[in-house]
Amino acid sequence: MLPAVSRARFVVCEDGSEYIDRFRRFLGEAFEFVAANDLAAAEAAATTAHGLLFDLDFRRTPSDRLVDERGATVVAPDEGTRRRLVESQGILILRALRARGVGLPAMLFADLDDATQAGFLERTLAPLVVAPSRMGLREIGAWLEGLARGTLT
């Protein structure tokens, strides 16, 4: 009997299931995808992962599970604060993970209007790739494969 082949494991951090459903459907034979819908779940899942995949916007996340720029939960934020936090929650979770010593390669799915902002994020939260919506599954799969083989960081 042949030993079971383990697949590279990636944490998908989002407030719904759109990304993880798509990845499991189209890339699931090659990779294992684990859901994480907040900082605590992402940190726990990261311990056995090859990389992290982030949505940017977390509109469906309850306020008591959002983190701010310091990685702290915000108790009953006002509407303006909540809007600001949900619109950048993927970045804030990744920033908190980096501050806690999680150095796994990450991909952030975001259409940023400013290339300078994308470059800043990629430098300050490295290793990070900011992936615009035009990036297809083939490109995403190739990046994941590179991480799994150890040829990318």
Where are these regions (language model features)?
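C-terminal output helix
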Residues: T116-T124, S133-L152
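Short acidic-hydrophobic, aromatic-tinged amphipathic segments that line or gate anion-handling sites
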Residues: V34-N37, L128-R138
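Conserved acidic segment of CheY-like receiver
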Residues: S6-E18, F23-L27, A35
